[in-house]
Amino acid sequence: SFDRPNIRYTVVAKDDSRRQLLAFLEEHRGQAGIVYCLSRRKVDATAAMLAERGVRALPYHAGLDADVRSEHQRRFLREDGVVMVATIA
């Protein structure tokens, strides 16, 4: 069903993407979410930057080992407040 009241999709014009992302995540501290990036490299860099700032962020893309992807997906589904950083593909 498309009726998913627990999911919110937001599009915001990009100005200073890093600052905007950090501010958004701070407003929603402790909540789960997905951040989409255009490349695997950007996924890895964004997940690392967020983790350095205390966000429970995990990368997720086809370039990761299948076991790592599976573990990150499991954590996202079972743990509170995990932010998945993924490619759009």
Where are these regions (language model features)?
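Helicase motor core with emphasis on the C-terminal RecA-like subdomain
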Residues: S1-A89
